[in-house]
Design a protein with these regions (language model features):
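Helix-to-loop junction immediately C-terminal to a conserved catalytic motif
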Residues: 52
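Conserved ABC transporter NBD signature motif
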Residues: 60-68, 77
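Conserved ABC ATPase "signature" region
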Residues: 104, 111-129, 181
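Conserved ABC ATPase signature
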Residues: 133-137, 141
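Catalytic Walker B motif of ABC-type/P-loop ATPase nucleotide-binding domains
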Residues: 158-162
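Conserved ABC ATPase "signature" C-loop
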Residues: 212-213
C-alpha cells in the first residue's frame, strides 16, 4: 500500500440485484498512469466513479495515500482528485472563467488565479482563447479547456472517463501526445478508461483488464502481451498491438 496513491480494496457495487463490481484489489501507484480496458459492461466507468467518490460502494474500502477514506473525510479527499468525462461539460461563459471557477470557489487570491489559469491555458496551447466564449470552441479546444480546468486544481489523482472518444482522429492524436507529455512532467497519478488501443502505448505505464466487474490482470503493456492470464486478456492485449 505504501506506493499506492489510491487503492480500492474488496469493492463490491450492485445495481439492483446485479453485481457490477467485485474488485479485490486495484492500486494506482504514485505518478503512474493506468489504462482501464475491457468490453462494454465490464465495470470500467463504474470503478472510476466509485474511486472518484461519485458512487458509494456496497462493500469494501478506498485508501488515499494509505489513509482510509471515511464518510467524515470524503470532502477532504475529494478535493485532492479531479475527474474528466467524455463530454467537456463546460460552463456557458468564457474559457478563463471555466478554468478559474474551481479556484474561486476555494477562495484563492485573484493574482494566484490569474497566474495558474494562464499557465495551464498556455500548456494546452489555448491561452489566446481566454476571453472567448465556450460556445465557439472546436471539439479539440473544448477538451483542452476541460483538461486545464481539472489540472489547474493541482489534483494528486486524476480520473479520465474516455475524454478523447468524441474527437476526430487527427485532433485526438495531437491532444493525446500533448497530454501524455504533461502527465509525465507533472507525475499526477492517473486512471483512464479507454476503448481506443492507440491511446494506451502513448499514455499508460500499466494496463488493467476488467471482465464482469473483476480485475483479471494488471501489468505493464509488455507483460500483458507476453503473459496474458487467459484468452480474454490475450484478446484485449492483441487489440493494443
Amino acid at each position: 500500500m505504501d506506493d499506492c496513491a489510491m487503492m480500492a480494496s474488496n469493492i463490491k457495487y450492485h445495481r439492483g440485484n446485479k453485481q457490477i463490481l467485485d474488485v479485490e484489489n486495484f492500486c494506482v501507484n504514485k505518478g503512474e498512469t493506468v489504462a482501464l480496458i475491457g468490453i462494454n459492461g465490464s465495470g470500467k466507468s463504474t470503478l472510476v466513479q466509485v474511486m472518484a467518490l461519485l458512487l458509494k460502494p456496497d462493500e469494501g474500502s478506498l485508501f488515499f495515500h494509505g489513509q482510509e477514506i471515511t464518510p467524515q473525510k470524503m470532502l477532504h479527499f475529494r478535493r485532492r482528485m479531479a475527474l474528466v468525462f467524455q463530454e467537456s461539460l463546460l460552463l456557458d461563459t468564457t474559457v478563463y472563467n471555466n478554468v478559474a471557477s474551481g479556484l474561486r470557489l476555494r477562495g484563492h487570491k485573484k493574482s494566484e488565479i490569474d497566474a495558474r489559469v494562464m499557465d495551464w491555458l498556455k500548456k494546452f496551447g489555448v491561452e489566446s482563447l481566454a476571453s472567448s466564449s465556450t460556445r465557439f470552441l472546436s471539439g479539440g479546444e473544448a477538451h483542452r479547456v476541460s483538461l486545464a480546468r481539472a489540472l489547474v486544481m493541482d489534483p494528486e489523482v486524476l480520473f479520465l472517463d474516455e475524454p478523447f472518444a468524441a474527437l476526430d482522429f487527427p485532433t485526438k492524436k495531437a491532444l493525446i501526445s500533448e497530454f501524455s507529455d504533461i502527465l509525465k512532467a507533472t507525475k499526477i497519478s492517473t486512471v483512464f478508461v479507454t476503448h481506443d488501443p492507440h491511446e494506451i502505448p502513448v499514455m499508460a505505464n500499466k494496463v488493467t483488464v476488467l471482465e464482469a466487474g473483476k480485475v483479471i490482470q494488471s501489468s505493464t503493456t509488455q507483460d500483458l502481451f507476453a503473459h496474458p492470464v487467459n484468452d480474454y486478456v490475450a484478446f484485449m492485449a492483441n487489440a493494443i498491438k
